[in-house]
Amino acid sequence: MDTKTHSLPITHTQLHSNSRPQSRTCSQCTCTHHRQTFSQSCRQSQRGSRSRSSSQSPATHQNPTGAHSSSGLQSQSPNASPPPKRHKKTMNSHHSPTRPTILHSSCPKNRKNLEGKLNKKKMAKRIQQVYKTKKRS
């Protein structure tokens, strides 16, 4: 029984690492609607992770997330499965069709950042070329 409880936090960290790229894509975009809806879901996941990490001694609190991935205890899995399902439904219904347009066309700050990076690269190349030509002559 001890080995099962030790393996559960590992699956919990794997589940969290899968959800992190979504928050990274959200932090890049500065659109207000996208940030508001995603920040709410981020807060919910942070609340859950805080409560799980603070109460590591009772194994019953960690079992729902472990049971979701390893299907060890099915009686407690309904307690943990509704929040991820709600999160996924909101992401699919609101953001997946609009996410490409948000990242590319409707976020002017994102576009400016990309243009700035390209301009910096161009300027670096120009400076290097000028430096090389001055050295030769």
UniProtKB/Swiss-Prot annotation:
Residues 39-57 have a biased composition (Low complexity). It holds the Pfam family TP2. Zn(2+) binds at residues 12, 16, 29, 31. Residues 1-137 are annotated as: Disordered. It comes from Macaca mulatta (Rhesus macaque). Keywords: Chromosome, Developmental protein, Differentiation, DNA-binding, Metal-binding, Nucleosome core, Nucleus, Spermatogenesis, Zinc. The gene is TNP2. GO terms for cellular component: nucleolus; nucleosome. Plays a key role in the replacement of histones to protamine in the elongating spermatids of mammals. In condensing spermatids, loaded onto the nucleosomes, where it promotes the recruitment and processing of protamines, which are responsible for histone eviction. Residues 1-31, 58-79, 93-108 have a biased composition (Polar residues). PANTHER family: NUCLEAR TRANSITION PROTEIN 2. GO terms for biological process: acrosome reaction; penetration of zona pellucida; positive regulation of protein processing; sperm DNA condensation; spermatogenesis. GO terms for molecular function: DNA binding; zinc ion binding. It is found in: Nucleus; Nucleus, Nucleolus; Chromosome. Belongs to the nuclear transition protein 2 family. This is Nuclear transition protein 2. Its main location: nucleus. Transmembrane segments: none annotated. Disulfide bonds: none annotated. A motif (Nuclear localization signal) lies at residues 116-124. Testis.
